[in-house]
A protein has these predicted regions:
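Acidic/histidine-rich catalytic neighborhood of metal-dependent amide-processing enzymes
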Residues: 1-72, 101, 107, 111, ...
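Metal-dependent amide/peptide-bond hydrolase catalytic core
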Residues: 64, 70-250
Length: 250
């Protein structure tokens, strides 16, 4: 807008029209752009101001993958966190089937950390935990609600073995944002540290699904990343089910 204002003030008379696009679905598939391209004429040239002033000379690679793990638990009914892949999750919700004493233990631990618990009509307890969201590329100062929930449930001591192991896996894989939990702690002079977040997850019908978003440095090798990630996932009982990669440029 400022560039066009400047050109107008200088008396510039363009030969072509200008259009502004305000997208609302960039982080979830860009369906709005697909709709526009289907119903309207596409511009001949576009400029996307998506970087801090004054200039960008590279972009980290973007690796997003899904992984699943079976969970055998009579205690942990459901566990869900996150609304988009490229964001440290702000909220997490879990439902547990517990005894009265176990419910009291969970409430004590969760409420001491600022979370809340609600008794449900079917006798289960629903747990809510809040984190501090941030973009996957800039996770500094954030707090993952998924990791926070996992840590609190493990600390309460009410989970059975497999559910407790899952909570340990979550904390180990996503407790830091710089690749250590997935055995990919890479960095370079040109683009800095690799970052990774567990953006979304859901436990449903005995299967835990996890989405992971990684921004990897420009000198990292995709094949090495995938090899280390796959080994780490397997060690925690996960199977890689789908992966999408956008190579870095520099």
């Amino acid at each position: 807008l400022y560039a066009l204002k400047y050109l107008k003030e200088q008396g510039y008379k363009p030969k072509h029209s200008f259009r502004f696009f305000f997208g609302c679905d960039e982080e979830k598939g860009m369906a709005d752009v697909q709709y526009y391209a289907k119903n309207y004429k596409e511009p001949a040239f576009s400029v996307v101001p998506d970087v801090m002033f004054p200039v960008c000379n590279g972009e980290k690679g973007i690796l997003e993958f899904d992984a699943t793990r079976p969970v055998k638990s009579s205690k942990l009914v459901s566990f869900e966190s996150g609304i988009m892949s490229n964001q440290v999750p702000a909220e997490a919700v879990a439902v547990l089937t517990l005894t009265g004493e176990e419910t009291a233990n969970v409430k004590e631990v969760v409420e001491a950390a600022g979370g809340t618990c609600e008794n449900q009509a079917d006798g289960s307890v629903k747990v809510y935990v809040h984190g501090i969201p941030a973009h996957a590329a800039f996770p500094e100062g954030s707090e993952s609600a998924e990791v926070k929930m996992a840590g609190l449930l493990k600390k309460s001591g009410v989970l059975d073995e497999d559910a407790a192991n899952l909570m340990d896996a979550i904390c180990e894989m996503f407790g830091d944002y710089y690749g250590a939990g997935l055995n990919i702690p890479f960095e370079d002079e040109g683009s800095g540290k690799l970052t990774h977040v567990g953006g979304m997850c859901k436990l449903e019908n005995g299967v835990f699904w996890q989405d992971v978003n990684i921004r990897y440095n420009v000198t990292a090798v995709y094949e090495v990343l995938m090899e280390n990630i796959t080994k780490t996932l397997k060690a925690h009982g996960f199977e890689l089910t789908e992966a999408h990669d956008s190579a870095p440029c520099f």
